[in-house]
Amino acid sequence: MSGLTVSIRGRNGAFAIEAGFAAEGGVTALFGHSGAGKTTLLKMIAGTLRPENGRIAVGDFTLFDAQKGINLPPEKRRIGYVFQDARLFAYMSVKRNLTYARWAGHRQATRSFDEVVALLGIGHLLDRRPSTLSGGERQRVAIGRALLSDPALLLLDEPLSSLDHARRQEILPFIERLRDESHVPIVYVSHEIDEVARLADQIVLLSAGRVTASGAAADIFPLIDAESEGGGVLLEGIVSAYDERYKLAEIDLGGASFQLSDAGLKQTMHVRLRVRARDVSIARKIPEAISIRNLLPVTVTGIERGEGPNAHVFLDFRGRRLGARLTRRSVDDLGLSVGDQVVALVKAVSVDRAAIREK
């Protein structure tokens, strides 16, 4: 088994969908506004809604192929599905909910019960009923149940949408462990930018039932940033040094570095940083005596002027895209044009703690 390949067209009532993308593994986020077609696409992958034509496969395991007449029923697709609500059996203990998945899957186990329980940190919950669990605990059990069915693919349909912020922060580290340690490809549906920034290896953008862009998270995230106040770009780096006196970590981005105030980072740790366009300023040259620590040499690659007071300036940093949201007046005052060599000033707060992850 390997990654997921989707190339389909179909309908859900009057709603038409046309989707094509390939995901190599890890977490593939389906991102779009409400009504974009995320859940419809997930249902077609799961087999509960039939496309009109096309093909869906996980590696060399074909789930649907209209031309060859293949349309496996949901129970034959080896897919673990986690919904917005946990959908646990209320009359069963947590342990029985988990073991039921193994029995219902009718497949030889590739992961031990104890391994899954340890991965999700639910050992202390085994004798409890779902009604006594918090929302985050119920979702962790639901993920464990899906994983114990020995899936070739996991589908997570907005699994955190019913949780408050505290419960989301509680469960996100376990989903990260699932991504990093289970080796099962995951399709993650969300309209929350923060979750996508933290979890996704690949992003598929959906709008009105069509895939508008897909690819590596670092490449696709700037497209979200250009349209959203909450977007940004993702930069991967490694902690190259740590200053104990000032509690500052230095992140090597390959030819440049960021300083990040975070006592939890350790040397040689691989991290992902998120930089929002609203937190990036531009200078013609490196300013003197400035409190901002993170300065990057960049090239202006594009300027998009809206009808309002703001403009979005597209920047290139050693082959990686950045963005800066400036006023149109600032763009004119700086005399910015495509090809200019300038300096991006990144405020310390724009390095999002929630977007940092250990690889």
Swiss-Prot record:
Location within or outside the cell: Cell inner membrane
Q: Major location, coarse class?
A: membrane
Q: Which family does it belong to?
A: Belongs to the ABC transporter superfamily. Molybdate importer (TC 3.A.1.8) family.
EC top class, in one word? Answer: translocase
What is this enzyme's catalytic activity, as reactions? molybdate(out) + ATP + H2O = molybdate(in) + ADP + phosphate + H(+)
Q: Which residues form the signal peptide?
A: none
Source organism per entry reads: Brucella melitensis biotype 1 (strain ATCC 23456 / CCUG 17765 / NCTC 10094 / 16M)
Q: Where does ATP bind?
A: 32-39
Which InterPro entries does this chain map to? Answer: AAA+_ATPase, ABC_transporter-like_ATP-bd, ABC_transporter-like_CS, Mo/tungstate-bd_C_term_dom, ModC_ABC_ATP-bd, Molybdenum_import_ModC, Mop_domain, P-loop_NTPase
Full protein name: Molybdenum import ATP-binding protein ModC
The record's keywords, sorted A to Z, are:
ATP-binding, Cell inner membrane, Cell membrane, Membrane, Molybdenum, Nucleotide-binding, Translocase, Transport
| Example of a GO cellular component annotation carried by this entry | plasma membrane
Q: Which residues form the Mop domain?
A: 289-355
Give a Pfam family name: ABC_tran
NCBIfam families hit by this protein: modC_ABC
Function according to Swiss-Prot or TrEMBL: Part of the ABC transporter complex ModABC involved in molybdenum import. Responsible for energy coupling to the transport system.
What SMART domains does the entry give? AAA (SM00382)
Q: In Gene Ontology terms, what is one molecular function of this protein?
A: ATP hydrolysis activity
Q: Which ranges carry the ABC transporter domain?
A: 1-233
Q: Which domain of life is it from?
A: Bacteria
The way this protein sits in the membrane is described as: Peripheral membrane protein
Description of how the protein assembles with itself and partners = The complex is composed of two ATP-binding proteins (ModC), two transmembrane proteins (ModB) and a solute-binding protein (ModA).
Could you tell me the EC number(s) of this protein? 7.3.2.5
